[in-house]
Swiss-Prot record:
Annotated ATP binding sites: 7-17
Purpose of the protein: Catalyzes the ATP-dependent conversion of 7-carboxy-7-deazaguanine (CDG) to 7-cyano-7-deazaguanine (preQ(0)).
Keywords: ATP-binding, Ligase, Metal-binding, Nucleotide-binding, Queuosine biosynthesis, Zinc
Name of protein: 7-cyano-7-deazaguanine synthase
Taxonomy, superkingdom: Bacteria
EC number(s) reported in the record: 6.3.4.20
GO molecular function: ATP binding; ligase activity, forming carbon-nitrogen bonds; zinc ion binding
Cofactor(s), names only, from the UniProt record: Zn(2+)
Cofactor info, note text: Binds 1 zinc ion per subunit.
Record CDD domains: QueC-like
Pathway terms, separated by semicolons: Purine metabolism; 7-cyano-7-deazaguanine biosynthesis
Catalysed reaction, written as an equation: 7-carboxy-7-deazaguanine + NH4(+) + ATP = 7-cyano-7-deazaguanine + ADP + phosphate + H2O + H(+)
Positions with a binding annotation for Zn(2+): 185, 193, 196, 199
Length: 236
């Protein structure tokens, strides 16, 4: 299938891009600038597109993001430290982010006569992000079937929606993902902080997958204390 991958430049979506390039006909990556403080992730998405020799579309929706106030990712709100399974991580929710991005990606796919859009939502996101859950994925597909009826037929591929980030690390390893060329940290500093939810989850995923983590962290060991109160099953 001719497939466009929604790629932020993070570990999950870059791994998905490499997987898609090996299993489908990857025809491009689409990324979004929504005013996120960690905009540097887009540079890693660009590197991925160049590596896989496909077009890279960066869609500027910062004006929209500016109205979705109250998130630590876009506003002057401190990014909390700790595990994603903690209630405090709800500060990182950008309301309706995936719905907005996927609607645009589906429009792009229809215009380019693509067969599918692939997105890297995964099981570890379910606790905090409602637009990463299977119910949302299924509902969005039904909505797009109606929205594009008679014009295009585009499938939503979400192969990681029921699996852990550790499983994505394992999958990325199989498909040759260069993990050092991905960016996760929400704080957007020169190095991964090692303390925010996405850094803790990233560090923990490599550990659980038994794969060496090439990432440079400002605090390489914080994840141990943050993750110690949760079982592997709880952080799916």
């Amino acid at each position: 299938m001719k497939t466009i991958v929604v790629c932020s430049g993070g570990l999950d979506s870059v791994s998905l891009a490499h997987r898609t390039a090996s299993e489908e006909q990857l025809i491009g990556l689409v990324s979004f600038d929504y005013g996120q403080r960690h905009r540097k992730e887009l540079d890693f998405a660009a590197k991925c597109a160049a590596r896989l020799a496909v077009p890279h579309h960066i869609i500027d929706i910062a004006a929209i993001g500016g109205h979705l106030s109250g998130s630590a990712l876009t506003d002057n709100v401190e990014v909390p430290d700790g595990h994603y399974a903690e209630e405090t991580m709800k500060a990182t929710v950008v309301p309706n982010r995936n719905a907005i991005m996927l609607a645009i990606a589906f429009g792009l796919a229809a215009a380019q006569k693509a067969d599918a859009v692939a997105v890297a939502v995964h099981g570890g996101d379910h606790f905090i992000y409602p637009d990463c859950r299977p119910g949302f994925i299924d509902a969005f597909q039904r909505m797009q079937n109606e929205a594009l009826d008679g014009y295009a037929s585009v499938k939503l591929l979400a192969p990681y929606v029921e699996v852990s980030k550790a499983a994505i690390v394992a999958d990325g390893t199989r498909h040759g993902t260069p993990f050092a060329e991905t960016w996760s940290c929400y704080k957007g500093g020169s190095l991964h902080c090692g303390r925010c939810g996405t850094c803790v989850e990233r560090r923990e995923a490599f550990h659980l997958a038994g794969v060496s983590d090439p990432t440079e962290y400002e605090d390489r060991d914080f994840w141990k204390a943050a993750a110690s109160q949760y079982s592997a099953a709880e952080v799916r």
